[in-house]
A protein has these predicted regions:
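Transmembrane beta-strands of outer-membrane beta-barrel proteins
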Residues: 119-121, 271-273, 305-307, 443-447, ...
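Extended lipid/amphipathic-ligand handling interfaces
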Residues: 256-258, 262, 288-298, 671
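C-terminal outer-membrane beta-barrel translocator/porin domains of Gram-negative envelope proteins
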Residues: 174-199, 397-400, 416-418, 471-519, ...
Length: 752
């Protein structure tokens, strides 16, 4: 879902006027928004944020600037924001767009600017992007490109440095040119992405005149404004933010926002997405582009930053995961009126230095130094899919914004197709996804458990509200719920162990019911608040196969019983990304849940806490991670509210799930380092935990005890194939045992 053309053609552009007003002689690049800047809060917050960003950058001293490579910016003496929201296609926005159209169509007319030279540096990230959970970097490339411009309109780019590193198995491929080089003039009159293989046939919102009636292509309206006053400049810069939407969303069109200079309509920033009809590749989910310009010498709007995001999925399968190619390029080291080679006009539009020179280029930062800054890891704002869908619905109505087919087969994980365990025996299933509109998605999953002879069904509808909040309605029949404190293994690993070794890493409950959930916030560094209510009927699974099918000498342990009945429950959960001392990043989750039996079974309140953090070297060849999981139950001693721990994923080096209780906590610290190559890693870990509050009847029925205090353990092992596969030896330090454990990277458990 991610290959690129090995020999792309260069992008095409059209001339754009550079401002000719006189002012200070220092560059003032405007602060670009992060990759998820399409998340739109209330107007006054957006206005304040834009003004604060402009002021913060203008007040900064010499040195590296966020999202820009610039030198010695001027200082701002003040800035103001005003509420200037207009109506669609009112007289004011039509006049502004006419100026912008004329500015774009004009030729370079400043006789004092004969040429410039600049350096473009950046990264191309290729990573796995699940709907929920951590991203996984597949490949990262770093480029350095000399940018040369000569009046009236000669643009040449030469790639002078290029290097890459593979972090997960992937075949070799080359990127399209607009992943490696700067797209000139904010794209041509026809917007193309990926040399026309991703997006094609889209009229540029600034290249078409403001038309009336049936000939109108886009609608425009002013949604925000900001004034920036620069030291040494008498007149302030007034910028207007214009929202753009297509008149006919079923045609290849763009949608998004433009930031324009009110004086002459010059483009300052452009953030665009596209309609589904714009996408050439049927694997495309969505594509967004951001182009930003900086003000140099108070008069020239020159390229500053470019971000292109291309998200793809398997066309006919909804796997709940996609891949993203994100390009982040920054332009700096400008030399105005520089002496350029006299034969520059005979150069190809894009050229490369020899291979040896590309490899030996002295990059200013390590290959992986920009992961947090560019929004791949850490605390950077991550685009919220709910907010993106909400923005698209507001601009497109009920026309889907995704390029994916509205109906696909749904396979959330490999074990949803086939699995094996001691309760269900052999299970076979398949699901489907239907997206009738941008605001609603329907998913179904059905299968059959052959050991008990029961169908297993699930249906889920989810959608978004006007302000990006999410909702979900779900129902299931004979769903398998686990009594473990945390999942013990990837489902596929559990199926293999049950099939070949007679080891089942589940303690299942047969659950049927309905659930409704509401999610507020979310996306990047903001708090995610989740409200949930449901009604469930719990039943015990009958003991299925007694022995492993491919090892008849090994018997399964018995299924642990719970009280059967119908239970109502409600919960409140808060999840938030967190910054930890020493540069660690991670997240925390707190959940409060109340449960009560509808037929007098009992009830109570449960609280749970989960913290995760990791620390990595710049080269990502050394890593330390820490996790804390805790849970407490207050109420009637229901078996269904006890949890199990011990062995893999909690306290390795002890028998699997030999402890239980209503209160428990587990702490783990693990470290890993490359053994000369990322293909092999040496791993080690320290673990500790305790469990208490075990009800005597539950202890007798389950054959478990509490831990009797803290139980520590250690582990040492080897990670293989970029740490995807892991073999660890573990030893419990208090009446424990030696264990050899096979596992896979937990980031992939939800896919297996």
């Amino acid at each position: 879902v991610s290959s690129e053309s090995p020999h792309p053609s260069p992008p095409r552009g059209s001339p754009r006027r550079i401002l000719g007003r006189r002012g200070t002689k220092n560059p003032v690049p405007l602060l670009p928004k992060p990759p998820s800047s399409r998340l739109r809060p209330a107007m006054f917050l957006r206005s304040l944020g834009l003004a604060a960003g402009l002021a913060a950058l203008a007040l900064a001293g010499p040195g590296p600037l966020p999202h820009a490579l610039a030198q010695t910016p001027s200082t701002a003496t003040g800035d103001t924001t005003t509420d200037t929201r207009g109506d669609w296609n009112d007289a004011r926005v039509r006049e502004l767009m006419a100026r912008a159209h004329a500015s774009r169509r004009g030729i370079i007319d400043d006789e004092e600017l004969r040429s410039y030279r600049a350096l473009t540096q950046g990264h191309i990230y290729f990573f796995v992007d699940p709907e929920e959970g951590e991203r996984s970097l597949i490949r990262v490339d770093q480029v350095a490109v000399d940018l040369l411009w000569k009046a009236p309109d000669i643009v040449r780019q030469q790639v002078v440095g290029e290097r890459s590193e593979v972090r997960l198995p992937v075949r070799d491929f080359r990127y399209y040119l607009d992943r490696l080089t700067l797209v000139q003039y904010g794209f041509g009159d026809e917007i193309q992405v990926g040399s026309g293989m991703d997006v094609a046939g889209v009229p540029h919102p600034l290249a078409v005149a403001t038309l009336e009636g049936e000939d109108r292509i886009y609608d425009y309206r002013i949604v925000d404004a900001v004034e920036l006053t620069l030291a040494g400049r008498a007149d302030p810069i007034r910028l207007l933010e214009v929202e753009v939407r297509p008149v006919d969303p079923q045609e290849p069109r763009a949608l998004g926002t433009l930031l324009l200079d009110e004086g002459d309509g010059s483009l300052v920033r452009m953030e665009l997405g596209f309609t589904a009809a714009s996408y050439v590749d049927r694997r495309t989910d969505r594509i967004t582009v951001e182009v930003d310009y900086g003000l140099w010498e108070g008069r020239y709007w020159l390229p500053n930053r470019q971000v292109i995001d291309v998200r793809r999925e398997v066309p006919d399968l909804d796997l709940g995961v996609g891949t993203v190619i994100r390009t982040v390029l920054r332009v700096g080291n400008y030399e105005l009126n520089a002496d350029l080679p006299p034969d520059i006009e005979f150069w190809p539009p894009v050229s490369w230095r020899p291979e040896a020179a590309l490899r030996n280029y002295p990059f200013e930062e390590p290959l992986l130094a920009g992961l947090e800054r560019d929004g791949i890891e850490g605390m950077e704002v991550r685009p919220d899919p709910r907010r993106l869908r909400s923005d698209a619905r507001r601009r497109l109505g009920q026309i889907p914004e995704s390029g994916l087919a509205p109906f696909r087969f749904h396979i959330p994980q490999a074990s949803s197709l086939v699995r094996y365990n001691r309760a269900e025996g052999l299970y076979l299933g398949l699901g489907s996804t239907l997206t009738p509109s941008p605001s609603v998605r329907l998913r179904t999953q059905g299968g059959f458990a052959f050991a008990p002879g029961r169908p297993v069904l699930a249906m889920e509808a989810d959608g978004i509200g006007e302000n990006g909040w999410g909702w979900r309605l779900a129902g299931n029949w004979n769903h398998q719920s686990d009594l473990g404190l945390v999942p013990a293994a990837a489902p596929l690993v559990g199926s293999l162990a049950a099939t070949f070794l007679g080891e089942d890493y589940l303690d299942p409950i047969r659950r049927s019911g309905v659930t409704a959930a509401l999610t507020l916030g979310g996306g990047g560094d903001r708090t995610d608040l989740r409200l949930e209510a449901g009604l469930h009927r719990d039943r015990n699974w009958a003991q299925g196969p007694g022995q492993a099918p491919l090892d008849r000498g090994r018997s399964f342990r018995p299924i642990r019983p719970v009280e059967e009945g119908t239970f109502a429950q409600g919960s409140l959960g808060v999840t938030r990304p967190m910054q930890f001392p020493g540069g660690g990043t991670g997240d925390g989750q707190v959940t409060i849940r109340t449960v009560w039996g509808m037929d007098g079974e009992g009830g109570g309140v449960a609280g749970s806490l989960r913290l995760r953090s990791s620390w990595s070297s710049l080269a990502r060849d050394r890593e330390v991670s820490a996790s804390l999981v805790g849970r407490a139950w207050a109420g009637d001693p229901l078996a269904r509210e006890h949890r199990l721990m011990g062995g893999r994923s909690t306290l390795p080096g002890y028998p699997f799930r030999e402890w239980g209780g209503q209160q428990m906590v587990v702490l783990g610290v693990e470290g890993a380092m490359d053994a000369g190559t990322p293909f092999f890693r040496i791993r080690g870990g320290l673990h500790a935990g305790m469990a208490g509050g075990l009800d005597p009847e539950v202890a007798s029925a389950w054959g478990v005890s509490d831990t009797g205090g803290i139980r520590p353990s250690v582990s040492l092992g080897l990670g293989m194939v970029w740490d995807l596969l892991r073999i660890d030896g573990a030893r419990g330090l208090r009446e424990g045992e030696w264990q050899l454990l096979f596992s896979v990277d937990p980031r992939w458990w939800d896919r297996l």
